[in-house]
Regions:
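Polytopic alpha-helical membrane proteins, predominantly small-molecule transporters/carriers
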Residues: 1-285
């Protein structure tokens, strides 16, 4: 039962972008709807759990949420350019690399020889995995597809910065997940409004995309519930499995066309990135 709870965040987070794409709307309507859904769920959680809230916790949570909005908006923009099945493995790999480097440099993780070996192996696996999942179709290789891939990577670098700050700022100020959840959601909505208002995102798609926001917040809730039961390392490792759902979902549910060569590359790449996530989880322990 505990392992099942720990897998739920991966299932929920891995399906968010699939819901976004399936429900429709551009990246701006999608991200705004998602943030509103997260806020609705987080308000409910706040009244049930009643975690500690102070001006410091509120400020940290809002900053974290603002940067989450930056990360999510740009991830959705990348999906529009290169698709879910390419975006999600690359995005996950970039996030793992950036948070790992930050963890080593600032929080002095990987303190033992074993953790250093596992960490370095994980980074190598991630880099190889990203290369394999981003293979182009040789028959359809045009200047436009090359240009889209380049733009997608640049957009994902900005997205990774957003996700990095979203994760790190909460840890740096030692704010618990339960306490951060509500102010984070406020920051997410504020960030969503700031990033999207020029693009006139207010339409019916915003309402439809509230559903992925509810799913995101539910994933967070199950992460907080599972961590004390299975440990941070295990819950972190299992949460990386979401890449399998989002990538395969992009191909199977959204009908993204892939050649045999690309499918093999994506399959091996996913295995490498998930393995890297497990290694990093062990290295953190």
């Amino acid at each position: 039962m505990d392992i099942f709870l720990a897998i739920l965040p991966a299932i929920f987070w891995g399906s968010i972008v699939l819901f976004n794409v399936k429900l429709g709307g551009g990246p701006y309507s999608q991200v705004l709807g998602t943030t509103i859904g997260a806020l609705i769920f987080s308000i409910g959680i706040y009244f049930v759990v009643q975690p500690e809230l102070s001006p410091r916790i509120f400020a940290v949570g809002i900053v974290s949420g603002l940067f989450w909005a930056l990360g999510q908006t740009n991830q959705l923009k990348s999906i529009k350019l290169i698709g879910v099945s390419k975006t999600m493995p690359i995005s996950t790999g970039m996030q793992l690399v950036s948070t790992s480097f930050f963890g080593v440099l600032v929080f002095h993780e990987w303190a033992t020889t074993v953790s250093i070996i596992l960490g370095v192996l994980a980074l190598i696996f991630i880099i190889v995995g990203i290369v394999l999942t981003s293979l182009e179709d040789r028959r359809q290789k045009t200047e436009e597809t090359k240009g889209n891939m380049k733009k997608g990577i640049i957009i994902l670098l900005i997205s990774t910065l957003g996700y990095l700050v979203y994760v790190v700022v909460v840890r740096f100020f030692d704010v618990s997940g339960w306490s951060a959840l509500f102010p984070q959601a406020i920051g997410m909505v504020a960030g969503g409004l700031i990033l999207t208002f020029r693009h006139k995102p207010f339409n019916f798609y915003v309402i439809k995309n509230i559903i992925p926001g509810l799913i995101w917040a539910a994933g967070n809730m199950f992460l907080f519930i599972s961590q004390p039961r299975v440990g941070v390392a295990t819950s972190f490792s299992l949460s990386q499995m979401g890449i399998v759902i989002s990538t395969l979902g992009g191909i199977i549910l959204l009908g993204e066309k892939k050649t045999k060569r690309q499918l093999i590359g994506i399959g091996i790449g996913i295995i490498l990135i998930v393995t890297a996530g497990v290694f990093l989880g062990i290295a953190k322990a």
